[in-house]
Structure formats: structure tokens, C-alpha cells
Amino acid sequence: MNEKIENLLKEERKFPPSKELKENANATSSWYEDADKNRLEFWQKQALTRISWYKEPTEVLDDSNPPFFKWFKDGELNLSYNCLDRHLETDSDRVAFYWEGEPGDTQEITYQDLYERVCKLSNALKQLGVQKGDRVAIYLGMTPEIVVSMLACARIGAVHSVVFGGFSSEALADRINDAKAKTCLLYTSPSPRD
């Protein structure tokens, strides 16, 4: 193996946060101390208390094949559930994200609104025959719908592949075909405003 790569795999340097960052961070100094004492135990605790699992992982880190590390490889979760559902009981009206497009074109998307949009699209994808493991190409602009599309795919276990909108039709076809996409989500007009 290349010596430079080998050296990077054995990185020992530490980069502590600045005083200002520490004072304004959500993490307390005890977090840093706990992480320093036993990083695997620290991350296991974070994963088990901050993430909803369908099947809790029994192994924190598989580092048997560097640099292809696998974290929590035997755990099972749903990203869409963790991003949306777990917030509905207490924070449904809280803003999940702010979107800003053209000047004056802004939206505040609440968890409840995002959840409803995601469920509607994930059900539509299922009606089209999209299943867990299928690939869905996403050819959308930078709009709230791109977030909805990615979370809808995650909700049903489909893999999304965002395709850059600046490619020629031939390049788009190549990428969509290479991904073996079962379906493609796109606008029917060049711009969502048209």
C-alpha cells in the first residue's frame, strides 16, 4: 500500500474545537471526555439514545477492511422514520427545513407537512411497483420536492439517485440506465414555476 495512504489510516492527531465553539456547542465537555476515554462506547451510546432502530446494532464498528469501515452494520433503521415520524408527537408544527428559491420565493416546511408529502409520494411509488432495493432516479431542481423525493425513497427502502439537471438528454439517459432505475421522478416542465 502507498506509504502516504498507510500513514493516513493511522492518524493520531487531534483537532480540538475552539473555545468559542465549545461555549456555544450543544455538546458538553463531558462528551469530549467520554469520547476520548472510549470512542466506540461513546458512539454506541449516541446511536442507541439518539436514533430509533428497528433492530439495534450489536457491533459498533467493523474496521477489518480499512479504509472501508462499517458502522453499526448489523443494525436496521429507516432514515425517513428517524427524520420525520419521531418528531411528530412533540414537534409536528416545528419547521423541519427552510427553503429559499428565487428572490421572494421561500417556504417553511414543518415536520407534519413534510411527513404528509413524503407519505403521499412513497405510496405513489409503491403503486408504481417500486419496492425495497429498487432504484429511483430523481431529476428535479433545487426545490422542496427533492427532499420529499429522497425521504419517500428511504421510507420504502428504495435507493435514490439524483441526476444533475445540466446534462444532455443522452448523458441523462446513460446515467439513468446505468443506475437501472425502475422509475424517474421529474418535472414535466423545464421549471417548477412554468
Residues of each region from the PLM?
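N-lobe entry segment of adenylate-forming
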Residues: 1-109, 113-116, 120
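Conserved AMP-binding/adenylate-forming core of the ANL superfamily
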Residues: 80, 97-151, 168-173
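Structured binding elements
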Residues: 157
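Short beta->alpha connector loops at strand-helix junctions that form conserved
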Residues: 163-164
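Active-site charged/polar residues at nucleotide-handling catalytic sites that mediate phosphoryl
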Residues: 179
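Short, Asp-centered acidic motifs that coordinate Mg2+ and/or phosphate
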Residues: 183
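Conserved small/polar residues in nucleotide/adenosyl-binding loops
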Residues: 187-194
